[in-house]
Amino acid sequence: MVFELIRPAPLTEQKRSRDGCIYLYRAMKFIGWLPPKQGVLRYVYLTWTLMTFVWCTTYLPLGFLGSYMTQIKSFSPGEFLTSLQVCINAYGSSVKVAITYSMLWRLIKAKNILDQLDLRCTAMEEREKIHLVVARSNHAFLIFTFVYCGYAGSTYLSSVLSGRPPWQLYNPFIDWHDGTLKLWVASTLEYMVMSGAVLQDQLSDSYPLIYTLILRAHLDMLRERIRRLRSDENLSEAESYEELVKCVMDHKLILRYCAIIKPVIQGTIFTQFLLIGLVLGFTLINVFFFSDIWTGIASFMFVITILLQTFPFCYTCNLIMEDCESLTHAIFQSNWVDASRRYKTTLLYFLQNVQQPIVFIAGGIFQISMSSNISVAKFAFSVITITKQMNIADKFKTD
């Protein structure tokens, strides 16, 4: 099977939570983010890393700016909006990539905590849940890959077949106006640069979802362990107390896991929140007023890409808050009424800690949730309204 990891492995195989990140880290290795620790190959690899950052993270946003400075008059309204919507996202993507790469050590360290959490997953039901979340996480990354690559490929083909480069980046060496061959060469070079940038952007957008999907699986397993507390009559009171202490330690490990990944997630999502409304607004204006059928298809793929950057993760954040509430209910409804005083005291301490939900704060300003995501996305309709009221679209068409 080509994509073996998108299906749950049989229980005869030993899977770990970190295996849910396999596709993610393979892509990181391909784009130059995970160099060998030593040897000559490390320096060869770092050269590749430098090239990807120079071309995909630095040149791409500057290439848009250069094209606006040198050939803005040659843009049609539709071409300009197609370029502008990606330009704004490219600057945001460069910021997100810088944040993710500089804090990559946090994501790697979080996998070590997952290994500690896996030590408690000995029951057959728990192993089955780990296998399921491993498949689901890798499947999610694969969906991101198809959508992001679909956008880049559809824009490339639709633009070239229409007789123009896909993004019209500044290129002082090749003039695409000098014949079909140079058009294809310039367009292909743009596509290669954009493909690298798209992969970098995909890594920055998909890791929050993957890491929180795994988090939810461990919250679910912890909830089931809490429900089983003092339900086994073969265990003594001291052994039941030890099981409770283990649940408390599991929760502390989960909080440590969240504390490590929060700074990375909060920075990248905050950057995306700042841009999503504006980018969606320009894209929808392009679709409604200036697009032909081919540009419309490419713009539609771009809209899906933009929505994938935040909506799945924000929805998962809502589910995590519900999971935390379910933990509280599980503790309260567990078999504690006739327990010892020491057991009840520890359980009360546990309950007080669990009542504080796990939340992610974008940029330390506002909570990441579906409501906040919808609020920032609504800005797109404000951009469209301003365009209609000022009659900007008709003025562009007239000019």
Swiss-Prot record:
GO terms for biological process: detection of chemical stimulus involved in sensory perception of smell; sensory perception of smell; signal transduction. The chain crosses the membrane at residues 46-66, 84-104, 141-161, 179-199, 269-289, 293-313, 357-377. One of its GO terms (molecular function) is ionotropic olfactory receptor activity. Residues 67-83, 162-178, 290-292, 378-399 are extracellular. Residues 1-45, 105-140, 200-268, 314-356 are cytoplasmic. GO terms for cellular component: cation channel complex; dendrite membrane; plasma membrane. Expressed in olfactory sensory neurons in the antenna. It is a multi-pass membrane protein. It is found in: Cell membrane. Keywords: Cell membrane, Membrane, Olfaction, Receptor, Sensory transduction, Transducer, Transmembrane, Transmembrane helix. InterPro entries: 7tm6_olfct_rcpt (IPR004117). The atypical heteromeric and topological design of the odorant receptors appears to be an insect-specific solution for odor recognition, making the OR/Orco complex an attractive target for the development of highly selective insect repellents to disrupt olfactory-mediated host-seeking behaviors of insect disease vectors. Odor-evoked OR currents are independent of known G-protein-coupled second messenger pathways. Belongs to the insect chemoreceptor superfamily. Heteromeric odorant receptor channel (TC 1.A.69) family. Or2a subfamily. Interacts with Orco. Complexes exist early in the endomembrane system in olfactory sensory neurons (OSNs), coupling these complexes to the conserved ciliary trafficking pathway. Odorant receptor which mediates acceptance or avoidance behavior, depending on its substrates. The odorant receptor repertoire encodes a large collection of odor stimuli that vary widely in identity, intensity, and duration. May form a complex with Orco to form odorant-sensing units, providing sensitive and prolonged odorant signaling and calcium permeability. Involved in the behavioral responses to ethyl acetate and pentyl acetate. This is Odorant receptor 42b. The gene is Or42b.
